[in-house]
Regions:
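Structural signal for conserved beta-strand scaffold positions within catalytic alpha/beta enzyme cores
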Residues: 5, 61, 88, 116, ...
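Cys-nucleophile CN-hydrolase/nitrilase-fold catalytic domain and related Cys-dependent amidase chemistry
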Residues: 10-80, 147, 151-156, 160-164
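CN hydrolase (nitrilase-like) catalytic-core segments centered on the catalytic cysteine
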Residues: 40-60, 128-193
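Active-site-proximal beta-strand elements of phosphoester/diester hydrolases
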Residues: 1-10, 112-121, 140
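Active-site catalytic loop in hydrolytic enzyme cores
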Residues: 67-134, 153-154, 161, 187-189, ...
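Short glycine-/small-residue-rich Rossmann-like dinucleotide-binding loops
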Residues: 27, 118, 144
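Residues at the C-termini of beta-strands that transition into short coil/loop
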Residues: 7, 81, 170
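Glycine-rich beta-to-alpha transition loops that act as phosphate-gripper elements at the mouths
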Residues: 63-66, 122, 170-171
């Protein structure tokens, strides 16, 4: 499974190598107004879907969506001509101007089960734990930019702990972490990461108090 991370350029305006899933950051679609999309005044989501059909691959694009005055950080997902859905960032920190979304982004794209993590959601481990339990083959993280070394550190830890490879697109930087704890970083305009999905499980036992196994005769 080959992921192509585009750190510079917009869908349709950059030459892409052959890949299974192409990932664009927040510069991919820019700001998308739902009302204009519905009225046909803009066709950004449709253009993304058409491009995925042209390239015969999945397409993951960061964007900011506007709906009735509410601004959200979102990711649009298309698969070979079909718009699969739009997922929103769930966690808004310290009075940011954005509105929080609800639910996890989980899609089957080009035969691969991918989970989405958007910007602030990276700071919350439950996001990755839930996506791992859902059976994701990979998690894609989309951020506006990587300001320090924390995001690469986190994706490395999450990939190792939860057994899911992670691809990160953050501004001009692309990162990849696999389940072994290895990490790769690139500042090229276009970067390819190859993932071999694995489903390795461990039997983990624990002891706890309570949950009595005694059968009561007066039940």
């Amino acid at each position: 499974m080959v992921f192509c991370v585009v750190s510079k350029g917009m869908p349709g305006r950059v030459e892409l190598p052959e890949c299974d899933i192409a990932v664009f950051g927040f510069g991919g679609l820019g700001e998308v107004d739902y009302e204009k999309e519905l009225k046909g005044e803009s066709e950004k989501f449709e253009e993304a879907a058409r491009l995925s059909q042209k390239l015969n691959c999945g397409l993951v694009c960061g964007c900011k969506t506007l709906s009735r005055g509410l601004l959200r950080k979102s990711v649009a997902v298309a698969d070979r001509g079909k718009l699969m859905g739009i997922s929103d960032m769930n966690h808004v920190l310290d009075g940011e101007q954005f509105k929080s979304g609800v639910g996890l982004g989980f899609y089957k794209v080009n035969g691969c089960k991918i989970g989405l993590c958007i910007e602030n959601d990276l700071m919350f481990p439950d996001t990755f734990k839930a996506l791992s339990l859902c059976g994701c083959n990979a998690v894609i993280v989309v951020m506006e930019e990587i300001k320090d070394g924390i995001p690469p550190l986190l994706i490395r830890a999450y990939s190792y702990l939860y057994g899911v490879p992670v691809v990160l697109c953050g501004g001009r930087t692309a990162c990849f972490a696999d389940v072994s704890g290895a990490i790769a970083t690139s500042v090229q305009d276009v970067t390819l990461f190859e993932i071999c999905p694995q489903n390795k499980y461990h039997i983990v036992t624990t002891r706890t108090r309570g949950i009595s196994s005694d059968i009561k005769s007066d039940y």
